[in-house]
Each structure stands twice: as C-alpha cells, then as structure tokens.
C-alpha cells in the first residue's frame, strides 16, 4: 500500500497545483485586472489614475505602493525572496520597493522573482493608444484592450473606439476574394472570408482556434455570431483636430454637431426675428413703467382729508 500523505506533503502539492494554474492563466489574464494597470487614488490630490510610482498630476509618492508584478503592498520576510533584507516581520512603503518599471511607470517590489521577470513580461511594453497615439507616460488614465481588434486604448477612447470597431464598413457579407458568403469575419480588417480563402500559407491555424485572417493574421470569428451594422459612425474625441496647445477634447465634436444642426440660413433668420421681437417687447414694458411713474406723481400732492387710511377717521365719528 502507498504511504499515507502527510499534511505538509498535501500543502506542497496544492501549492504546486495553484502555481501551475497561475502560470497557465497568466497569458490570458485581463489587462484591466493586471496589478501594473490597477486603479489608484492619490493620497494628496485624491485623483483616480493608473497604478504609478508617482502621481501623474501632483508627483507625490503614495504611502502604500503596489507591486506591478505581484500586486502586494506588504512584503513578508519569511515567505518572500527579498533582495534587500529588512529587519522586522514585514515591510511596507518605500522599504518594500526595489525598482520602477520603464514601461508601466509602477513600483516593483524588492522580491528577486518580481525584479527579474516583470520587465520582460510587462503587458504595457508597447501600450500606445491606437486612437490618440498616447503612451503610458503621456496621460494619467489606465490602459485597456479593444475586445474586437485587441489594440491598446486609453481610458478616454475605449468606449467610442469599441463602438465603432465592431462596425463592418462593407455593404455585404460576401467574401472579398469571391462572391460566396463569408463565414469568417476579421474585426481588424473589417472583411469577410469564406472557408477556402481563409487558408493562408503565411499564417498557420492553431489547433482548437478559429482560422487566422489571411491579411493581418488576426484570429477571425464566425459571421453568424456577430451582430454588426454596415454603417460607419464618426463621433467622439478624435473627430476634430487638435487645439493649439496640443490637447484634444469633446469641444470640436459639439461644435460640429451644432453647426450641422443649425447650419442653414433660415434658422439664423428666424433667430434674428425672435431677438427683434424680444427687443420690441422690452421697449413696450419700459414705456409702461414710465407712464405709471408719471401718473403716480400727479396724485402725490392730492389731499383727501381725514380718512380711515390716515388713521384720523375715528375722531370724526366721536365728534358726531
């Protein structure tokens, strides 16, 4: 009979199994849930931003830095491979950090494993927004990945890009190489392909996955599973040009919207007529006020004798 497993052996096997699952799921972890892309609130200016070594807005250092690799805020001496040996049971704050990543601009703890592996496996190595072309060092927000083309997006453009990225610009769902119906759609090239034309000599199909796009190599999806419109939408921050100081916002979008809505001359003529009518009404109101003041001046010197309003009427009643 096999030997009975001890408690320490069971714990070691469970730990190895958990580490194996973590290594397998590390490549499929969501970018928004990665420690180097976590949400952080500055202790000084109270502004929310991406996890950073220094605040993007006020350059202050956080009281509890978060490791960009393991996500911990406290280094335990017994259970960690510390490069810098520290006195006491644990260390926090600047005593826990060991480096700053050049790609994600976040602290890395002084653990040997984090220091040696994070720079090579940082998910924000080439993180540049596909819409505004800003990197991690150019804005304070978090970085996201498009669900359709899997390009990097900043926090300002993520919703608008994904809303327009799922739109097919073609008027038909037919294959681009023939007239047959395309069963596979590439969301990066915005094109459909049939079964025969998805086969490519350059990009090989992996086992258990959809065939790659013959143009860009991006994984295709079945057209029947997609709910896409054939209209292309133009809206959001990137529709207008940048301003003089290099900042672009929603001002150009609202200006274009208002100009399209009220651009005809008939609207401006009606608006001028309304302004003239309002001016005439104001002049009439002023004339009425002047006439009221003149009539009140005429009756100021009029004496009606002792009346109830003057307070002397009760004397006349007693005399009678």
Curated annotation (Swiss-Prot):
**Acidic residues bias spans:** 269-285
**InterPro entries registered for this protein in UniProt:** NOA36
Keywords linked to the UniProt accession? Centromere, Chromosome, Metal-binding, Nucleus, Phosphoprotein, Repeat, Zinc, Zinc-finger
Q: What are the record's GO terms for cellular component? A: chromosome, centromeric region; ciliary basal body; cilium; cytosol; midbody; nucleolus; nucleoplasm; nucleus
- List where the motif Nuclear localization signal lies: 3-11
Q: Which GO terms describe its molecular function?
A: metal ion binding; zinc ion binding
Subcellular location per the Swiss-Prot or TrEMBL entry: Nucleus; Nucleus, Nucleolus; Chromosome, Centromere
Pfam family membership, one: NOA36
Mapped zinc finger ranges (C4-type): 42-58, 67-104, 129-149, 175-189
Protein family according to the UniProt entry? Belongs to the NOA36 family.
What protein name is recorded for this chain?
Zinc finger protein 330
Originating species: Homo sapiens (Human)
Q: Which gene encodes it?
A: ZNF330
């Amino acid at each position: 009979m096999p030997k009975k497993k001890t408690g320490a052996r069971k714990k070691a096997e469970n730990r190895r199994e958990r580490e194996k699952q973590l290594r397998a799921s590390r490549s499929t972890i969501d970018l928004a849930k990665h420690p180097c892309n976590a949400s952080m609130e500055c202790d000084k200016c109270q502004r929310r931003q991406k996890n950073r070594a220094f605040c993007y807005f006020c350059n202050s250092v956080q009281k509890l830095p978060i490791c960009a690799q393991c996500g911990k805020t406290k280094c335990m001496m017994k259970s960690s491979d510390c490069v810098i040996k520290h006195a006491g049971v644990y260390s926090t704050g600047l005593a826990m950090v060991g480096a700053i990543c050049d790609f994600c601009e976040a602290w890395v703890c002084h653990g040997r494993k984090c220091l040696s592996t994070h720079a090579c496996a940082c998910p924000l190595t080439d993180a540049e927004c596909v819409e505004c072309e800003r990197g991690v060092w150019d804005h304070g927000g978090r970085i996201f990945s498009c669900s359709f083309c899997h390009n990097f997006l900043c926090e300002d453009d993520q919703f608008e890009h994904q809303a327009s990225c799922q739109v097919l610009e073609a008027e038909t769902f037919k294959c681009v190489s023939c007239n047959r119906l395309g069963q596979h759609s590439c969301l990066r090239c915005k094109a459909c392909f049939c079964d025969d034309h998805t086969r490519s000599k350059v990009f090989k199909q992996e086992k258990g996955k959809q065939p790659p796009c013959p143009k860009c190599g991006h994984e295709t999806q079945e057209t029947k599973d997609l709910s896409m419109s054939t209209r292309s939408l133009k809206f959001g921050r990137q529709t207008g040009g940048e301003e003089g100081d290099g900042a672009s916002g929603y001002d150009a979008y609202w200006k274009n919207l208002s100009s399209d809505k009220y651009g005809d001359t008939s609207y401006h003529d009606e608006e001028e007529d309304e302004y003239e009518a309002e001016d005439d009404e104001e002049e009439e109101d002023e004339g009425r006020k002047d006439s009221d003041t003149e009539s009140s001046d005429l009756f100021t010197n009029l004496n009606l004798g002792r009346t109830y309003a003057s307070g002397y009427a009760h004397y006349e009643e007693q005399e009678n």
